[in-house]
């Protein structure tokens, strides 16, 4: 990369304006999933059929659909069902093996998806549980926290309005900020009236 990954993704979307919001969300979340789980996915992508780029893309899409809030449900089984219409039977079987993989059998650096230099630094610090918790947190998709413009809106009212919309996300108060909202899922915020109005 010659730029941060989010800029690479943004540049791609500018070059491909015909992509819809759902396509953009799936592509972006798949790319970031591959980066978050690079060691694990690279090791598994060394097997299977097709090009390694396709295998990595399929693993990224599976992660985006099962963990990124973009699939029909946040489970590997539903991600496989969501992908079934675009993959070959051998790819389906390969992805099923990946979903059933016992990650505890992987080498710690691969399982925790950390670069070697960072893993070595982690190993030299005390607290196995803290290291493991941090590694797991770094593999999760980032949550979306927003600050409510209290001049224009009240957080509790806005939470009610957002959750009344239904859909595939949920808005909850942030744990620390009295003016914050944490959004679970990947809503298209730019289309909502309350977001446009500030």
Predicted feature locations:
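Conserved SAM-binding loop and adjacent beta-strand
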Residues: 196-198
